[in-house]
């Protein structure tokens, strides 16, 4: 969920658009990256993803770049990756405000 922070801390994302889990998104900016709330971000040779489920999106994105769109579509089909979540609360913008605030209050993504 937060692997992009390692890239940012190493200085590899300075001045680049990037994403990570929404609870740690502001940390990217502290290391010079340009945080965005998108699920998958490609900037140059770097591809970053938000929370754990967006890792599948990132994998398909990379596969498309490496092996072609048809191959990525075939893998998506064979794995039956067709997200239909039972709740529409997969981002802070969609989730109930009390849940967002609860998790922000308990967040451990604190760097000094």
Describe every region a protein language model picked out.
Residues 2-112:
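Active-site-adjacent pocket-lining segments in enzyme domains
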């Amino acid at each position: 969920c937060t692997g992009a922070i390692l890239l940012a801390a190493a200085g590899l994302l300075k001045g680049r658009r990037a994403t990570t889990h929404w609870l740690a998104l502001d940390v990217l900016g502290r290391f010079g990256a340009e945080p965005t709330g998108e699920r998958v971000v490609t900037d140059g040779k770097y591809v970053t993803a938000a929370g754990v489920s967006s890792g599948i999106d990132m994998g398909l994105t990379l596969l498309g770049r490496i092996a072609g769109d048809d191959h990525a579509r075939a893998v998506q089909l064979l794995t039956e990756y067709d997200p239909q979540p039972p709740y529409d609360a997969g981002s802070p913008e969609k989730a109930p405000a009390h849940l967002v605030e609860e998790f922000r209050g308990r967040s451990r993504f604190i760097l000094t």
